[in-house]
């Protein structure tokens, strides 16, 4: 059997499979279906400083080869995540977990990361800079190298845990943003978040999503994700976590060849709740098929 282990920012993973934030809850919900310790780790639901009720419904729409969501970062806030959600997780998951953090100001991000820094089970902070900047006209932090770097630097000041910055694909030059985050002290980069999409109901001529637009994810964005992972991994010296349309062991191999150290699986969890477990179990056979002895050896192996 091939070696599935990888090292992500100094922490060893049994395998590179990571259910993506927003598609796996706080983990314990899936523990009723299978042993989630089979996973490398997972990124729990996006956490903000204060509780958020999310966007009005409908906030999910089916699309060709994917889906659109505009959930709006619904979560109980960092204090309840620490006091209620993480204790439940500790009973069923015995590995470091990735904490996904969102915010609407630099201060929001720093506060939430500082609170999570004290949690022993949190191994990495995945900082989602795709959120709108309430003090910057609503523009996403992740569309500006300077703004993304500012958040990175602020978070690095309040934590000793590895900081992975999650980037938006809705930009013209994702490489410059990744490099700005690296220069500001980021320990890793994860990409891509969802692409901006929209559907319209032909009967009432209104957007299907109450928020009008939302994040498009699923198999259709996989080639875009592979391209961006390849570009970023060739431009930075820190680890890259690849995601976007991944749904099979073959997709994982392709993403790693593009330069990903670990791979997140998002929308596919909503189609098949066992998909991440199945990918972990399928990897040895796929590795044998392509004569791969160790996954860590193929990272960035695309010629």
State where each predicted segment sits:
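Short acidic/polar active-site loop segments enriched in Thr and Asp
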Residues: 39-40, 45, 95, 122-125, ...
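C-terminal helical cap(s) of enzyme catalytic domains, especially alpha/beta-barrels
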Residues: 55-64, 200-214, 256, 268-293
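A short, charged, Gly/Pro-tolerant segment at domain boundaries
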Residues: 296-303
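N-terminal capping/small domains of soluble enzymes
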Residues: 1-97, 102-104
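Short gly/pro/ser/thr-enriched loop/turn and capping motifs at secondary-structure boundaries
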Residues: 48-53, 132-134, 196-199, 270-272
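Short donor-sugar binding/catalytic loops of nucleotide-sugar-dependent glycosyltransferases
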Residues: 246
């Amino acid at each position: 059997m091939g070696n599935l282990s990888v090292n992500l920012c100094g922490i060893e993973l049994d395998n590179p499979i990571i259910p993506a934030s927003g598609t796996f809850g706080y983990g314990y919900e899936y523990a009723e279906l299978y042993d989630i310790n089979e996973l490398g780790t997972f990124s729990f639901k996006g956490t903000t400083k204060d509780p958020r009720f999310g966007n009005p419904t409908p906030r999910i729409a089916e699309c060709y080869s994917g889906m659109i969501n505009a959930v709006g970062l619904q979560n109980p806030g960092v204090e309840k995540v620490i006091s209620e959600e993480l204790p439940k997780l500790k009973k069923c998951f015995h590995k470091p977990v990735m904490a996904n953090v969102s915010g609407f100001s630099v201060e929001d991000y720093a506060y939430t990361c500082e609170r999570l820094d004290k949690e022993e089970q949190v191994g990495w902070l995945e900082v989602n800079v795709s959120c709108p900047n309430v003090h910057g006209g609503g523009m996403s932090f992740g569309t500006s190298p300077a703004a993304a770097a500012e958040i990175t630097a602020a978070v690095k000041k309040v934590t000793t845990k590895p900081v992975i910055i999650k980037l938006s694909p809705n930009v013209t030059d994702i490489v410059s943003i990744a490099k700005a985050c690296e220069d500001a002290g980021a320990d890793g980069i994860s990409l891509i978040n969802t692409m901006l999409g929209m559907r319209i109901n032909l009967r009432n001529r209104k957007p299907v999503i109450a928020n009008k637009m939302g994040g498009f994810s699923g198999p259709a964005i996989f080639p875009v994700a592979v391209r961006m992972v390849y570009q970023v991994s060739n431009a930075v010296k820190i680890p890259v976590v690849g995601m976007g349309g991944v749904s099979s062991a073959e997709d994982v191999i392709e993403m790693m060849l593009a330069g990903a150290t670990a791979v997140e699986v998002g929308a596919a969890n909503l189609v098949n709740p066992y998909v991440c477990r199945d990918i972990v179990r399928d990897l040895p056979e796929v590795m044998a098929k392509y004569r791969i002895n160790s996954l860590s050896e193929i990272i960035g192996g695309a010629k």
